[in-house]
């Protein structure tokens, strides 16, 4: 096993740990989930570039008769990238005392101001940061509004 294979195993393990945390652990942290809303995906260009580069590495490894283990590890890395970037749905998860947005816990008392833009983007101003929440279904904005009013 080469150092390349060890690095690939490390990256696959990191992506798998992130996927498990995002899918199973995060919704169970900080109390019961009150509301979980699907968000729009950000640009997919980065994911296409990543999976494309891994596909080029697989092709290069196969044509140069590289180690089969490396080919399998690169394939697993491509599948993990495909899952994380294309199959997994980003979500905002509301709890009793706060919410998870982009895997970061934010308490409700940190929200200083909220606005709704013309194109349906909910803008939350925190102390030093502004969150742009783009929901997949525009009707979910009303659910978020009702939940925030009830918890404030």
From Swiss-Prot:
Question: Which GO CC terms are listed, alphabetically?
Answer: plasma membrane
- Regions crossing the membrane: 6-26, 45-65, 67-87
One Pfam family matching this protein: DUF986
Listed A to Z, the keywords are: Cell inner membrane, Cell membrane, Membrane, Transmembrane, Transmembrane helix
List localization entries.
Cell inner membrane
Q: Which InterPro entries match?
A: DUF986
Name the domain of life this protein comes from.
Answer: Bacteria
Major localisation: membrane
**Recorded topology in the membrane:** Multi-pass membrane protein
The UniProt similarity line reads: Belongs to the UPF0266 family.
Write down what this protein is called.
UPF0266 membrane protein YobD
